């Protein structure tokens, strides 16, 4: 058996997407494994964002799996890692972990992790071999929305200021770099080196959705961001708005600003005719997790975040961040 690991190529993308769906759908026990992920797409957007961070594995010249690195400045994670079911339990996955570790090192990532199935000892054991350790559960949460705001949202809206938000797609091109600097300043204040500029630009250039920029009531200071995918061919899929990352600056108004941000996301979703919001909440970020429950989000499924060196990173009880590292 001849194993070859290399960078993923554009002409691999269809096969890589097929293997990803088949792998995850088979593991989850679906009658039709290829229906997993619906019409969402993880492979193409992540490859387009950074081809140097997309990896392929071949056996005897045939593509059998892929893996991706995502870097947010000093923070990085990898996945989804997929191997064709024919090659499960043959020690193949480890060949796709080594190159991502090398990539994380080259990018000088200080805080690295991944998301995996909490119920699978096999997955957890594999990653522990490389010094990734399970910490808190991450809940993938959803909220169904309607044209008329439900009573709970109205109640919350009355308690908190109305959003003062701008969407990145509405900003003039000549000032976008300044806005990106503000975003970097905000996230760096939450965790040193955390930088979502690449993610914001990927969403903008690939037309995957939009980024909400939440300002204080004066409209002068950025207090939060929410990077959202929506629609077919994105990581969300049809009729879904997926909050891939959101963060609120740390201050006395963090909790109320978090609710304002959720209001802004919901308003955008309603405007786009979208009926569901999906977002990940690490349970170590207790106040954010609790706020999402109070807002009407419910857990759809749970995984576990595994952290290199067992670092806590930005997962503290009082940190208002949304992400899931899938």
Functional labels for PLM-detected ranges:
Residues 78, 104-119, 271-281:
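Conserved GNAT acetyl-CoA-binding A-motif
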Residues 80-83, 89-106, 111, 128-129, ...:
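Conserved acetyl-CoA-binding loop-helix of GNAT-fold acetyltransferases
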Residues 129-242:
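Amide-forming acyltransferase catalytic core, primarily the GNAT-like/NAT-type
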Residues 60-66, 76, 220-225, 241:
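Glycine-rich phosphate/pyrophosphate-binding loop shared by adenosine-nucleotide-utilizing enzymes
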Residues 74-86, 236-251:
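Conserved acetyl-CoA binding element of GNAT-fold acetyltransferases
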Residues 90, 94-95, 106-111, 118-137, ...:
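Conserved active-site alpha-helix within GNAT-family acetyltransferase domains
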Residues 57, 69, 83, 214, ...:
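GNAT/GCN5-related N-acetyltransferase fold signature
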Residues 13, 17-68, 191-212:
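Active-site rim helix/loop that mediates acceptor-substrate recognition in acyltransferases
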């Amino acid at each position: 058996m001849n194993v070859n690991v290399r960078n993923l190529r554009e002409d691999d993308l269809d096969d890589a997407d097929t293997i990803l769906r088949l792998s995850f759908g088979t593991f989850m026990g679906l009658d039709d494994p290829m229906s997993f992920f619906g019409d969402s797409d993880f492979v193409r957007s992540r490859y387009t964002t950074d081809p140097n961070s997309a990896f392929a594995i071949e056996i005897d010249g045939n593509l059998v799996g892929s893996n991706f690195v995502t870097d947010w400045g000093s923070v990085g994670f990898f996945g989804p890692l997929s191997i064709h079911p024919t090659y499960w339990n043959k020690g193949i996955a480890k060949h796709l972990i080594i190159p991502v570790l090398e990539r994380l090192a080259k990018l000088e990532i200080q805080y690295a992790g991944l998301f995996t199935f909490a119920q699978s000892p096999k997955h957890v054991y594999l990653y522990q071999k490389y010094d990734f350790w399970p910490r808190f559960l991450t809940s993938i949460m959803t909220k169904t929305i309607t044209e008329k705001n439900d009573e709970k949202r109205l109640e919350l809206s009355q308690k908190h200021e109305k959003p003062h938000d701008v969407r990145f797609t509405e900003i003039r091109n000549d000032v976008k770099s300044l806005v990106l600097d503000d975003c970097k300043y905000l996230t760096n204040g939450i965790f040193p080196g955390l930088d979502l500029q690449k993610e914001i630009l990927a969403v903008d250039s690939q037309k995957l959705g939009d980024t909400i920029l939440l300002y204080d009531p004066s409209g002068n200071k950025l207090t939060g961001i929410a990077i959202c995918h929506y629609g077919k061919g994105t990581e969300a899929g049809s009729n879904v708005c997926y909050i891939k990352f959101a963060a609120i600056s740390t201050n006395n108004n963090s909790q109320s600003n978090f609710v304002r941000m959720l209001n802004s996301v919901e308003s955008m979703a309603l405007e786009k005719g979208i009926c569901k919001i999906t977002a990940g909440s690490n349970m170590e970020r207790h106040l954010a997790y609790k706020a999402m429950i109070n807002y009407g989000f419910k857990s759809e499924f749970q995984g576990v975040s595994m952290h290199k060196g067992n670092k806590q990173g930005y997962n503290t009880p009082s940190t208002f961040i949304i992400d899931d590292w899938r």
